[in-house]
A protein has these predicted regions:
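N-terminal pre-domain/capping segments
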Residues: 1-127, 147-150, 155-165, 197-205, ...
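Short, small-residue-enriched loops and turns at beta-alpha junctions
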Residues: 55-58, 90, 138-140, 177-181, ...
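Glycine-rich, phosphate-binding/catalytic loops in enzymes
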Residues: 65, 149, 188-190, 220-222
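Surface-exposed cleft-lining segments at the edges of enzyme active sites
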Residues: 97-101, 138-148, 173-180, 218-228
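Active-site groove signature of glycoside hydrolases
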Residues: 114-146, 167-178
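Basic- and aromatic-lined ligand-binding clefts that recognize polyanionic substrates
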Residues: 166-196
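Histidine/acidic-residue-rich catalytic or RNA/ligand-binding cores of hydrolases
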Residues: 185, 214-220
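Adenine-nucleotide cofactor-binding loop residues
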Residues: 208
Length: 245
């Protein structure tokens, strides 16, 4: 048995960027079929990370629907891993720095996501994984009051940690440069330090956004590499060490 990280395919590309003004969504069944068919040199995906939003997996799924989902994943030999909580206003959530009502909506979606995560664990299909969140607000709106808004986001995240702890779940703030208070690596570190709950919330980011952090794309003051950076291996390694130390 190896100790390498498990290779999971994310399901959210089937929904993100899709819709009436773009290409149609890719169904969860199709995403699972494509994931199962992928094979590079004998390496296959061992699981999937789920987007808890319709038309894939409704955040309001019933226990029977979650059980059916677990059975479907098991049929492919997949484990469930990370879960994306739909914390944004268009999916029923609200800004983490918004009004009391908006923040309550944000936390409601976190609670529902943690409940689904717990159910999947109890069904034996999800041995590990986090619940992914972000600030659900734009960089532009955040910039109207950086200090005050960062405090509000941190307070909302702390409440989210309390919710996750009640379900035995862990949270991860998704490092994407489009989210207010998270648009630069120093701001992301600052936010996590303000939350002050490292036992309950961590950080995750795809490689593209990790590289955008080093470039300071949405936060030039946090840029690590020089403006004329040419992606040399040594320079990139140094930047990533700075980012992750």
């Amino acid at each position: 048995m190896n100790n390498y990280p498990k290779l999971h395919n994310a399901m959210w590309p089937g929904l993100v960027g899709k819709g009436p003004d773009s290409e149609p969504p890719i169904s969860l069944d199709t995403m699972l079929e494509l994931t199962a068919a992928a094979n590079v040199g004998g390496q296959r995906f061992e699981g999937v990370d789920l987007f808890l939003a319709s038309p894939h997996t409704s955040i309001d799924s019933t226990p029977d629907e979650i059980k059916a989902l677990a059975g479907k994943l098991a049929g492919y030999g997949f484990a469930a891993g990370s879960l994306v909580a739909p914390v944004w206003p268009p999916t029923g959530g609200g800004s983490a720095m918004g009004s009391e009502e908006e923040r309550r909506a944000f936390l409601t979606q976190v609670r529902k996501a943690c409940s689904i995560g717990r159910q999947l664990k109890d069904l034996g299909i999800r041995p590990s994984g986090v619940v992914r969140i972000d600030s659900a607000c734009s960089v532009h709106d955040w910039a109207a009051d950086p200090e005050g808004n960062q405090k509000k986001i941190a307070a909302t995240f702390r409440e989210a940690c309390d919710i996750a702890d009640g379900y035995g779940e862990l949270l991860a703030a998704e490092g994407e440069i489009c989210w207010g208070g998270m648009q630069g690596w120093k701001k992301m570190v600052n936010l996590l330090e303000m939350v002050g709950r490292p036992e309950h919330i961590g950080f995750q980011a795809d490689m593209a956004h990790t590289l955008l952090y080093t470039l300071g794309y949405n936060a030039p003051e946090d840029r690590i590499v020089p403006e004329d950076f040419n992606w040399d291996e040594a320079g990139l390694a140094s930047a990533l060490r700075t980012l992750t130390k």
